Structure formats: structure tokens, C-alpha cells
Amino acid sequence: MKKIIALHALFFSLLILLSGCTNGTIVNPTAEGQAFQINTYNYSDNHYLLDTIYKSNFIDFMAEGMLNTPENINRQISPDNFEVWVQTTNFTADRKFASMLIDLPSLPASGQYNDSFYVPGQIPGKRYFGLFRKLNSSEYYVNYQAGFIGLRINIPDNDYAGVTFKQNGTGQTFGTNSSNFTQDTLVLKMIKAGNIFPQTDTLAWEMKMKNVYRIPVIPILETGFEFQVNFVDPANPTPSPSLPNGRTVLNVVGLDRFIGHGPQLGQDNYFDFLNGRTIITETGDVIFPILRPFYDGILEATNNGFTGGDTTLICKAIYTKLKSEASIAPNNSMYIIKGRVKNF
């Protein structure tokens, strides 16, 4: 019986890896569970803030699981008429042409964008005109309070994606959705640009989240789930759960802030398994509460009040360079994400 279970685990892991939706590696699948390992520069490419202003919402929500400041509460997104569109080359009846802007303003009081918004044009990383298809709700998930989207499908690097949404508190609408507007061409708020470059496509780069890691096994069950972030000192390559100053890495990157499931604050040296917040069990997404955990999180933890943080321990390239460059940058292997999951 154990051999059958082990074979099932191996087959399931291979099936998920072949689907192309994950960023990690399965290590030694057994009947006791499947170990995984993920490099810190290999974050998910499927998660985006709806706008850079939602950085504040994200931090606010991840701290307590709810929004606290009036500004963030006002920006909370309505699920009504929320739409996601991705670039396509397939001409069918349900496709739409769309003009997409990274810095799209809210819809004017007249209820119509100026004609200039509908004119075909392209500025890399900022504006795009093309053919798009509307995603169904099974192809993505949205955190309406934190203001980010997770795509359940992969989109080619050179393709664009955009959304339409309305803010509950302000009443502002961004984009023209297909339910309320009958024009042949839509106007969309760009969330993903094609082939972005950090140095030139600054807004598009900021909106791409680099703090979500997709575990290569789904669905995730809390029972038997293990998640660790270890520090690897170049002078002593044995992985350690702690930084040289004794702070545990899991706490430093924001994933061990509570006793159990909370709300009591404190470290228990276990991953804070908060479904819908630090983990999405259906997709295997682990969401770090800090947008740049291996940069800002490390600096804050090593700040002794005089130096501003130990810059020799940060992985800046993750957040300033493309993955291909970050993978060969200094310190690229200083931290390793690993764990184990049982899903049967």
C-alpha cells in the first residue's frame, strides 16, 4: 500500500511540474510527503498589484488581515464588474480590442474617456493597443482589500494584461468593462506589460510582485505542511534558520509573527498558516507580508541603530534585475526556501 501511495505522489508531482505553473523543485517524494525547494530569485510571475498605490493596502492588510487606515479602506475594490483581460491572437466573437495604459486615470464624471484614449498606439511598458480575451473567474483570484491579483494561468512574457475595477469608498472607476460599455474598443488599466525592463518600465516593474512563491504541489493541506527559509553563510554552507545576529529568517521575512493562527503576536518557529493571507491553498501560493522580504526585511532585522542594516546580507538583485540576472548575482544563494507538503 505504501508503494502505491508513493507512486501516486511521484506521478502527481510530475504532472504539476509539467503543467508549467510552478517555480520550485520537488525533492524525494515519499509516502510521508513531498519535499520542495525554491530559489529566492525564482518568485511567481503570476502576481500583480493593480496599481502602485496598493502597496499601502497590501502592507496594511497583511499586518492584521484587514484594512485600518481610511485611505486604504476607501481604495478597497468592488468585486462587481471586475474584469481581467489578457492578450490573444485568436479572433472569436468574445474577443475585444482594447487600449491599455499603465497610469490610466479614473473614468471622468461624463462616463467616457477622451477619444485620445481609444487611438491605437504603443509605448513599451506604458501603453498598448491589441486584441484581448476576458478571463473567467476560475483563471485568477483577487484580494479586493489588498489590491492584488493572482493569475492561475501562465501568460507569455511578451504579452499584456489589464483590468477594469471600481473603488468602493471613492466610487472611482478605472477602465471600461464589457458589461457596461458597448464600444468595440475597451479602455483597460494595464497590470502586466510585455517584456518589461526594471530600469525603463518602472511602474510596470513595481506592480509585478516579487514576494509570492508558488509551491510545486497542489492543493496544500495544513496537516503535514512545513515551510522554512534558511540562511546560507558563504563561509559555512550549512543552512541555518537564523541570521548571524540570531534572528530567525522566517520571522524576519514576516512569516512567523503569530502564535499558531493568531491573533496573539509572537514567534513559535512555525510558518503562519493563514489561508487567504500568507497562503492560497488551491494554487500553492505563499505570500510574504513584506513586498521585498530579502531586502527590506533583512535590512530592518540587522539595523542596530547605527548602520541602517547589514547590506552584505541582502539580495537586492531580486528586486532590481530580471530573473536571468538575479540568478547569477552575488548573494543569489544566500537564502533558500524549502519545506514539505502532504496532499493525499
Language-model segments: residues:
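Bacterial N-terminal signal peptides that target proteins for export
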Residues: 1-9
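Bacterial N-terminal signal peptides
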Residues: 8-19
